[in-house]
Regions:
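Gly/Pro/Ser/Thr-rich low-complexity, intrinsically disordered segments predominantly at protein N-termini
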Residues: 1-115
């Protein structure tokens, strides 16, 4: 659910959230994220392992990251997301903060309670 505010939020507002509070920033609006369930985490770990092993066994140059992993979708930092799994093949998109620009592939696990 987005915060009811007319203002446009920025990445600085995300950074100012209390430790442990997870949220995404989409078009300047903050969306809080519920902690993932045990089932969600288990499935995410399995999928992550399969993708990572496939990339390694095929000597791929792509890198795979599991959430929390920052993806900044625009240069103005009005959109910041944390996909469950991100695959990035262009090393120029990666820096110490995470990924700037769209990953080559993402996996988002949606549970019935997310709807």
């Amino acid at each position: 659910m987005a915060l009811p505010k007319e203002d446009i939020y920025t990445i600085e507002d995300i950074y100012a959230l209390p430790d442990g509070e997870r949220a995404e920033l989409i078009d300047g609006q903050i969306y809080y994220m519920a902690p993932p369930s045990r089932k969600h985490q288990k499935l995410s770990g399995e999928i992550f392992g399969i993708i990572r092993e496939y990339i390694r066994s095929n000597h791929g140059a792509c890198e795979v990251y599991a959430a929390p992993f920052a993806v900044y979708l625009d240069e103005h930092t009005n959109t910041y997301v944390e996909p469950d799994i991100s695959v990035i093949c262009d090393p120029k998109k990666l820096d110490d903060r995470g990924c700037t620009g769209a990953p080559d592939w993402i996996v988002e696990i949606v549970s019935p309670s997310s709807k």
